[in-house]
Amino acid sequence: MSKVGNNSGDSKNTLYCSFCGKSQHEVRKLIAGPTVFICDECVELCMDIIREENKTSMVKSREGVPTPQEILKVLDDYVIGQPYAKRVLSVAVHNHYKRLAHAGKNNDVELAKSNILLIGPTGCGKTLLAQTLARIIDVPFTMADATTLTEAGYVGEDVENIILKLLQSADYNVERAQRGIVYIDEIDKISRKSDNPSITRDVSGEGVQQALLKIMEGTVASVPPQGGRKHPQQEFLQVDTANILFICGGAFAGLDKIISDRGRKTSIGFGATVASPEDRRTGDIFRQVEPEDLLKFGLIPEFVGRLPVLATLEDLDEPALIQILTEPKNALVKQYQRLFEMENVDLTFHENALSAIAKRAIERKTGARGLRSIMEAILLDTMFELPALEGVREVVISEEVVTGSARPLYIYSEQKEKKGNVSA
């Protein structure tokens, strides 16, 4: 039932949302039903919940294995661009669980596991792809940072901690954990530090690669129950990693130079045309990667062999960055518009302003990751001044504001009323 205030004559007829308790003055719209009321904010929340449930149920197909098309469709809702990488991930995840669904039915051919390596410049969506997969695939999922890993016995995390995190995400259900997905980020940071053997042991580089080999290929890892340190007296949980899918991702800074150098050597001679690395985008160069380039970068041959599926991601171009700014559910423009709504102010971006923001991100070579810092710099003064100003109803951001040659345009309530009267 809706609540009716009894404190004063003004509040006697005030209506309240039956779900969140907000009054009709705190929301834009209050919809009346038989003896109940619901506000526009609660309606939006209900619609979001229904949409999420529809997306989750959509990826359920025959035998419980989502088809590649179904996985791709959900990835497209959250991740802009990268069609090739999304297709590779969709097929790999589908095949992985199809293999598990048919395990033991026909033993004449044993299907090997295909772990995945994602290579792409910074800010192109590698981590977001993995996080989105976690949201749409109903299996335990964990993310690990390769920079924190060291060999067992040294200060830092050992590789078995990854399996422990996966087990925790499965609520210590070993059967479910053994069908999970592990994403290891910053995998390029564990490359061999140099070609020359050193007196000091490389515990965070080649040593970690060696330690990861076993769990990626398939081994029975001993994990302490409910976390904590290992003690000789305690019983361990045995987790078989043979059916855990490993996805590794990294920016591989400098790999483009290795690939370009190899291209130059193979293009020597009269009439050979070699494009300068400066004339080609990093994503285009990465597409020509070969296993030998990864070996030169510092990955050991056995480790490269454990990652047979290779997907390269492209640099995000201007249209893709504009889409990222405006289209996803949690798009940056929508986030800042919601912030300004809290001050009862509309925030408007001209199309050429969004284009200028995207161009600046491309110049900085930070990809989508750099968009937030650019937006913060543009709106800093406005967000500082706005709470103390009265009567502002709209803030307009033009291309000149992004380039720094003008200030944001403030439109006051009187001006808005005049505009409305003129158009009427």
Swiss-Prot record:
GO terms for cellular component: HslUV protease complex. The keyword Nucleotide-binding applies. PROSITE patterns: CLPX_ZB. One of its GO terms (molecular function) is ATP binding. Gene3D superfamilies: 1.10.8.60, ClpX chaperone, C4-type zinc finger domain, P-loop containing nucleotide triphosphate hydrolases. Keywords: ATP-binding, Chaperone, Metal-binding, Nucleotide-binding, Zinc. CDD domains: RecA-like_ClpX. Residues 5-58 form the ClpX-type ZB domain. InterPro entries: AAA+_ATPase, ATP-dep_Clp_protease_ClpX, ATPase_AAA_core, Clp_ATPase_C, Clp_protease_ATP-bd_su_ClpX, ClpX_bact, P-loop_NTPase, Znf_CppX_C4. Zn(2+) binds at C17, C20, C39, C42. Coiled coil: none annotated. The keyword RNA-binding does not apply. It holds the Pfam family zf-C4_ClpX. ATP binds at P121, T122, G123, C124, G125, K126, T127, L128. GO terms for biological process: cell division; proteolysis involved in protein catabolic process. HAMAP family: ClpX (MF_00175). Component of the ClpX-ClpP complex. Forms a hexameric ring that, in the presence of ATP, binds to fourteen ClpP subunits assembled into a disk-like structure with a central cavity, resembling the structure of eukaryotic proteasomes. Belongs to the ClpX chaperone family. ATP-dependent specificity component of the Clp protease. It directs the protease to specific substrates. Can perform chaperone functions in the absence of ClpP. This is ATP-dependent Clp protease ATP-binding subunit ClpX. The gene is clpX.
